[in-house]
Curated annotation (Swiss-Prot):
This is Small ribosomal subunit protein bS16. The keyword Transport does not apply. NCBIfam families: S16 (TIGR00002). InterPro entries: Ribosomal_bS16, Ribosomal_bS16_dom_sf. The gene is rpsP. GO terms for molecular function: structural constituent of ribosome. One of its GO terms (biological process) is translation. The lineage of its organism: Bacteria, Pseudomonadati, Pseudomonadota, Gammaproteobacteria, Enterobacterales. GO terms for cellular component: cytoplasm; small ribosomal subunit.
């Protein structure tokens, strides 16, 4: 089953997440099919708001193909 989920990056105590298309059997930060965006939950002093960038065209394509988003990714996409 193909999933749309977050893969963690960044440093200790400063998380950064890639929004990836992956097989559900792969590890959280393991192999992925395609990277479709990123999410940074930490506010930085030099920019306003949270960092979120998503290629909605590719997300719609994968949803059409039957990919299921994780709860967190679904919440992020709905807020766009």
């Amino acid at each position: 089953m193909v999933r749309i989920r977050l893969a963690r990056g960044g440093h200790k105590k400063t998380p950064f997440y890639h929004i990836v298309i992956t097989d559900s059997r792969s590890a959280r930060d393991g192999r992925f099919i395609e990277r479709v965006g990123f999410f940074s939950p930490i506010k930085f002093s030099n920019r306003t708001g949270l960092g979120l960038r998503v290629n909605l065209e590719r997300v719609k394509y994968w949803l059409y193909k039957g990919a299921s988003p994780s709860d967190r990714v679904l919440k992020l996409i709905k807020n766009l």
